């Protein structure tokens, strides 16, 4: 990073305390008043290309790779997950479950705004608003978490999946700042409306706010007992920092959510392995809903995204750098000790199963932003660069996480102000 930095310490005891933990103090800058400012990309507008830093890969090579990935998932008829409909809309298709999810729709929108693909962005948003949005009833303002490719909500009043709304809101803010608000959509007002709507529920009809108002944490699902639990991978402190800055409503509440999310991620990360559970209580304890179809206390499907969330927050804001370096070091060293072999574990590392996946390779490479161990970071970055583009029936989830990870690691996943 071509920045003059100094360590954020005022006394040597603090520095020695960090060093005794094996964690380096985080570099900071000083602003014009001499006050320390974290050296995250939000403050510096400097986005690192780790492929270049660690592997010597040129910007031209990186750009070609990103274009290849775009064509793979959005253009190529044999491998894409982006499909356009006759009504000037488009959707991201979950090829494994054969449905359309707010998760994928919002990921697709984020990818499009990062790559300046406004036409595709608008078509995805048009589909989500037309088919997924509840315009009346107890879920009004929320988005049904999955639909058929023909736009029919699956099941009787399907609930929302909180990460969909989170990525919708943030991608709409970015769209507002990139393209303005005078086209097909006033993107800023679209984002503001969701932010207001999802915090306007009092529970009287069985539906609550997207965030638990006491814990300041995003809920697993804002209904029933699920309102009092979370999914660690839904906790995106870097996004919540931006909401606190840009929201027109509940600003004081949003200011409290980034640190709450950071604490949750730190609490949920196992103290030896660094592994996260798929679902947890608000204190980070692994949690499984009664009669659930699989053991959500394990590191399995959702949990792989936690490394991406932590890495993004580290390089965007750097406000919890010591904790984040420590938890990512535990996590990636655990995977290295497992020879990057398995995909699923109990959070203590027992009962390994499955094969180390494309999504894990991507998310862990984003986590490498927070590593002090440069050799391990290089190994993770190399794995991401070398990973073949996913194909076949289950290319959707791993593929979307992989594509966003490639944008992060190449310096192309940016805060669009």
Give the residues covered by each predicted segment.
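Bacterial N-terminal signal peptides that target proteins for export
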Residues: 1-8
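Extended ligand-binding clefts on enzyme/binding-domain cores
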Residues: 29-68, 75, 98-102, 137-144, ...
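Aromatic-rich carbohydrate-recognition surfaces in CAZymes
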Residues: 98-105, 154-179
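C-terminal functional modules
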Residues: 345, 349-417
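Bacterial N-terminal signal peptides
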Residues: 8-17
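Boundary at the C-terminal end of the N-terminal hydrophobic targeting segment
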Residues: 19-25
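Internal amphipathic alpha-helical repeat/solenoid segments
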Residues: 65-104, 113-157
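Short glycine/serine- and small hydrophobic-enriched flexible loop segments
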Residues: 109-116, 167-178, 238-242, 308-312, ...
């Amino acid at each position: 990073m071509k920045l003059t930095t100094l360590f954020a310490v005022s006394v040597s005891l603090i520095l020695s305390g960090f060093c005794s933990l094996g964690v380096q103090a985080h570099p900071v800058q000083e602003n014009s008043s001499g006050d320390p400012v974290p050296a995250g990309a939000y403050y510096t507008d400097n986005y690192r290309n780790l492929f270049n830093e660690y592997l010597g890969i040129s910007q031209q090579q990186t750009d070609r790779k990103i274009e290849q990935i775009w064509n793979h998932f959005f253009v190529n008829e044999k491998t894409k997950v982006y499909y356009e409909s006759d009504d000037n809309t488009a959707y991201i298709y979950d090829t494994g479950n054969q449905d359309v999810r707010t998760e994928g729709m919002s990921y697709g929108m984020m990818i499009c705004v990062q790559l300046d693909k406004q036409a595709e962005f608008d078509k995805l948003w048009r589909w989500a608003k037309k088919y997924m949005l509840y315009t009346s009833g107890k879920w009004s303002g929320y988005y049904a978490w999955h639909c058929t490719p023909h736009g029919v909500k699956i099941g009787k009043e399907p609930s929302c999946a909180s990460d969909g709304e989170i990525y919708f809101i943030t991608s709409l803010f970015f769209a507002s700042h990139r393209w303005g608000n005078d086209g097909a959509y006033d993107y800023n007002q679209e984002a503001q409306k969701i932010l207001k709507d999802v915090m306007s529920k009092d529970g009287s009809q069985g539906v609550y706010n997207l965030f638990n108002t006491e814990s300041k944490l995003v809920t697993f699902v804002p209904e029933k007992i699920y309102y009092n639990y979370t999914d660690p991978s839904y906790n995106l402190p870097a996004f919540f920092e931006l909401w606190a800055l840009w929201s027109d409503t509940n600003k004081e509440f949003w200011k409290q959510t980034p640190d709450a999310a950071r604490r949750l991620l730190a609490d949920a990360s196992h103290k030896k392995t660094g592994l996260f559970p798929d679902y947890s209580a608000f204190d980070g304890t692994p949690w499984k809903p009664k009669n659930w179809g699989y053991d959500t206390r394990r590191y399995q499907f959702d949990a792989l995204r936690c490394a991406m969330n932590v890495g993004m927050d580290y390089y965007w804001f750097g406000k919890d750098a010591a904790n984040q370096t420590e938890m990512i070091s535990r996590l990636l060293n655990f995977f290295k000790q497992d020879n990057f072999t398995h995909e699923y574990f109990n959070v203590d590392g027992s009962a390994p199963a499955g094969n180390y996946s494309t999504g894990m390779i991507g998310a862990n490479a984003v986590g490498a932003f927070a590593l002090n161990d440069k050799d391990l970071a290089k190994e993770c970055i190399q794995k991401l660069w070398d990973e073949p583009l996913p194909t076949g029936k289950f290319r959707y989830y791993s593929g979307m996480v992989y594509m966003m990870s490639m944008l992060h690691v190449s310096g192309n996943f940016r805060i669009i102000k």
